[in-house]
């Protein structure tokens, strides 16, 4: 009896490594790319739901950045968009170090030669010329080829009496091309002035982000200026301005809603309504059906 009082209890032992391996084995196998995170509300969104909602957050209505290919799919009649000057590609006019590598990387990532797609297409059978900037290609920065392609499509619209739509999405002039990139601001604006002299319609649609030299030139020259919700629109960065004027800017500063309030843009249009809204504007301005 006394022996039993001082007898050690028997304990079961667990092998931690065996338990750990079992837990690993039981983890669900979730394929990558099924979910994505909203940059605005941090919600996790099922990618298929996002795609079906035109890449707009189903929780907070944040408009995700989209490629020109997706934009064409959403705006134009099926199989009517014809891309023009697709083969134009950038050289290195000022021999900027590593510039070719950055271009090659962007081309590989996006499948595009440059940061803008230009061409003609139809919206409910109304023919328009169009330029769509690509924020995924070096942040949509404007170099010589971007400037040349936009100028050419504006000139094509002028010669063929077509309205022109430009979807802007850019970080501004491309620093790797120096003064040559800045020259594109005046070049595009001059082409748009000739388009305007013929009494033709020019609509700009500001998408996130629209900044720098693009904002300072053709983005704000439209006869009608539209924007997607919560779009960043500005010239210099917020911190640069605050440090220059030594003041704290409003939270909504450089957002499309702020610009609408101050009269810089005409309307904020949600992506799901953009095609119908553009069609109404084109009809009101007497754009004829495609023949």
Swiss-Prot record:
Zn finger intervals (C4-type): 38-60
InterPro entries assigned to the protein according to its UniProt record, in alphabetical order: AcCoA_carboxyl_beta (IPR034733), Acetyl_CoA_COase_Trfase_b_su (IPR000438), ClpP/crotonase-like_dom_sf (IPR029045), COA_CT_N (IPR011762), Znf-ACC (IPR041010)
EC annotation from Swiss-Prot or TrEMBL: 2.1.3.15
Main location: cytoplasm
Domain CoA carboxyltransferase N-terminal residue range list: 34-291
Pfam families for this protein: Carboxyl_trans, Zn_ribbon_ACC
UniProtKB keywords: ATP-binding, Cytoplasm, Fatty acid biosynthesis, Fatty acid metabolism, Lipid biosynthesis, Lipid metabolism, Metal-binding, Nucleotide-binding, Transferase, Zinc, Zinc-finger
EC supergroup of this enzyme: transferase
Cellular component aspect of the GO annotation: acetyl-CoA carboxylase complex
Superkingdom field: Bacteria
Annotated protein name in UniProt: Acetyl-coenzyme A carboxylase carboxyl transferase subunit beta
Provenance organism: Clostridium botulinum (strain Alaska E43 / Type E3)
Lineage: Bacteria, Bacillati, Bacillota, Clostridia, Eubacteriales
